[in-house]
Amino acid sequence: SSDLRVVTLPDKKLIFQVRTIFLRSKEMIVVLSLFMFSIVAAMIWLMAGNVSALYDDAALGALDVPLKFSLASFVVFSFLSFEMSYKLRRYKLDECMDTVTHAKRKIFLAQGIVFAVVIFAFFIVFNIWWLISFIKYRNFNCWHGKFIIQTVLNMLLSHFFLPCCAAAMGMSASLLFHRINGCLGLVLFTLLGSPLSNYLGEMFYSFSRDVSINIFPFLRLFDVFPPSLNYAPIFAFGQSVLPYRWLTVLFWFMLSLFVISLKTGERNRRFRAAPAVFALFAFAFLVVSQIPASRVA
C-alpha cells in the first residue's frame, strides 16, 4: 500500500508549488475576491432587509438566494480550473518531474487538491450565510425537519459537489481542446444548463411544429443547476435535491475523471483500468438519471 501511495499521490512539495502558482496568479485572486465580495454583499443586503413575519414565502425567497449562486460557482471554478491547467503547463512542472513516476497525473491531482480546499472555504462561507439566515428567520413556520434536511443537501450539492465537478470539467477541457475551443465549450455548457435552455427548447419546438423536434431530453444532460422557482420558492428546496440532479452531476464528474485519467495515464498496469472504470460509472449514472423515478421526491 505504501508503494501505491508513492505512485499515485503528489508529495507536499508539489502541492505547495501548485498552491504558490495559484496564489501568485493575479487573475485567480481577483476573480475569487470579486466572487467573495458578491456573496458578502448579497448576504448583507438580505440580512439588512425586513421581512414580514406573516409571510413564510418571503422568508423562503430570501433563503433561496444562496442557491442562485450555484451557476456563478460553476462558472468561476470551471474557468479558473481551466486557466490554472494552462498556467501550470506554462510553468512546465511535468518536464521538471521527468524522473518522477506519473508526473502529469500527480500535477493534476495536486491542482484538484488545491481547488478542493478553495471550494471548501467558499462552502463554509455559504454555510455561515445559512446559519445567519436561520437565526434571523428562526420564528418562521418553514423551519421543520424536512426543510432543514433539504437545505443542508442543497448546500452540499450546489456549493461543494457541483463546484468540484466544475473544477474537474475545467481540467478535462484543458486536455481535450485548445484554449479558445475549451472556453467556448464551457460557455456552451453553462448556457445549456441555465434557465435560457428552456427558451431554447421551446424555440426549437415552436419552429418545428410539423416534425415536433423535442430537444428537452437532450437538455436534461445539462440540468445540474437548481430550478428557478421564484413564484413558489418553497418547492425549490425539494426540487433541487431530487436524485436526477445528483446523478447528473456525478455523470459529468466521472466523465471528467475519465478524460483526465485517459489523457494523463502512463503505461502502467495499475492504472490501465482506471479510464474504463470511470467510463462505466459515468454511463451508469447517466442511465439512472434518465429514469423517470429519479425525478420524483
List where the protein language model places each region.
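Hydrophobic alpha-helical transmembrane segments
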Residues: S2-L88, M254-V277, F281-A297
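Helix-loop-helix units of permease transmembrane domains in multi-pass membrane transporters
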Residues: F82-V118
